[in-house]
Amino acid sequence: GRDAYIAQNYNCVYHCFRDDYCNGLCTENGADSGYCYLAGKYGHACWCINLPDDKPIRIPGKCHRR
């Protein structure tokens, strides 16, 4: 696993305000835990700890939300 911003489709982060939202999102996806990283590179976004390698993470480049 890896520590990273979990990504939605099209390389977009999950925006957040509360740690419990991110912890739930991350653990549902197999991570050990997660929290809301405030005022980071992508604003307030969910950061996961030990997220499985098969789950999408935010990579450099644009968020292509449709």
From Swiss-Prot:
Pfam families cross-referenced by the UniProt entry: Toxin_3 (PF00537)
Disulfide bonds: C12-C63, C16-C36, C22-C46, C26-C48
Cell compartment(s), UniProt: Secreted
InterPro entries: LCN-type_CS_alpha_beta_dom, Scorpion_toxin-like, Scorpion_toxin-like_sf, Scorpion_toxinL, Scorpion_toxinL/defensin
Assigned GO CC terms: extracellular region
PROSITE patterns the record matches: LCN_CSAB (PS51863)
Gene Ontology MF term list: sodium channel inhibitor activity; toxin activity
Propeptide: 65-66
Keyword entries, A-Z: Disulfide bond, Ion channel impairing toxin, Neurotoxin, Secreted, Toxin, Voltage-gated sodium channel impairing toxin
SMART domains xref list: Knot1
GO biological process per UniProt: defense response; venom-mediated suppression of sensory perception of pain in another organism
SUPFAM superfamilies (alphabetical): Scorpion toxin-like
Domain notes: Has the structural arrangement of an alpha-helix connected to antiparallel beta-sheets by disulfide bonds (CS-alpha/beta).
Similarity comment: family membership: Belongs to the long (4 C-C) scorpion toxin superfamily. Sodium channel inhibitor family. Alpha subfamily.
Protein task: Alpha toxins bind voltage-independently at site-3 of sodium channels (Nav) and inhibit the inactivation of the activated channels, thereby blocking neuronal transmission. This toxin has a strong analgesic effect when administered to mice by intraperitoneal injection.
Protein name from the UniProt record: Neurotoxin BmK AGP-SYPU1
Organism, as annotated: Olivierus martensii
Organism lineage string: Eukaryota, Metazoa, Ecdysozoa, Arthropoda, Chelicerata
Gene name of this polypeptide: AGP-SYPU1
